[in-house]
Amino acid sequence: MALRSVKTPTLITSVAVVSSSVTNKPHSIRFSLKPTSALVVHNHQLSFYGSNLKLKPTKFRCSASALTPQLKDTLEKLVNSEKVVLFMKGTRDFPMCGFSNTVVQILKNLNVPFEDVNILENEMLRQGLKEYSNWPTFPQLYIGGEFFGGCDITLEAFKTGELQEEVEKAMCS
């Protein structure tokens, strides 16, 4: 599988994913190609070369909801297992994302004990958590069993002192 920008001519074989960021909204198209065929992407136009090329979009499996009842129960147990829980990319010792690292540093600065959950280890957890919190991005911070926010909200609350107040309330309850 190859992922290339459509800004320059690209040769892709087997399975191709073509992304375009022309409108600042990435669009992806996935095609199955015969191994002897090729897909050339140039100036936002697709040209196909190969003998007897049959192009068809691949089928995507989309469930109605990634948040199964079992996963919802697991998430409820996780967010209530500690006073502060951070769902993040990576771990507190090795964050795999700048936003996750920012929230970890804020919590460490406040000397807040927290549980970290690496969402990169489980795709079902990652997708289900987006539905559970109704929040599309990570990290996701939970305080006292309630969703608090992502990186931007946490950073702003840290600057205003609101984060420390919420953490103190949760620790005392």
Swiss-Prot record:
One Pfam family from the record: Glutaredoxin
Reported induction: By sodium and magnesium chloride.
UniProt entry keywords in alphabetical sequence: 2Fe-2S, Chloroplast, Disulfide bond, Glutathionylation, Iron, Iron-sulfur, Metal-binding, Plastid, Redox-active center, Transit peptide
Residue span of the annotated presequence: 1-63
InterPro entries associated with the record: Glutaredoxin (IPR002109), GRX_PICOT-like (IPR033658), Monothiol_GRX-rel (IPR004480), Thioredoxin-like_sf (IPR036249)
Molecular function GO terms recorded: 2 iron, 2 sulfur cluster binding; antiporter activity; metal ion binding
Gene null: resulting phenotype: Plants display high sensitivity to external oxidants, and their content of protein carbonylation is higher than wild-type plants.
Binding site for glutathione: 89, 126, 130, 138, 151-152
Extra remark beyond the main annotation: The GRXS14-BOLA1 apo-heterodimer model derived from NMR data shows a domain arrangement totally different from the holo-heterodimer showing evidence for a Rieske-type ligation of a [2Fe-2S] cluster.
Protein name: Monothiol glutaredoxin-S14, chloroplastic
Gene that encodes it: GRXS14
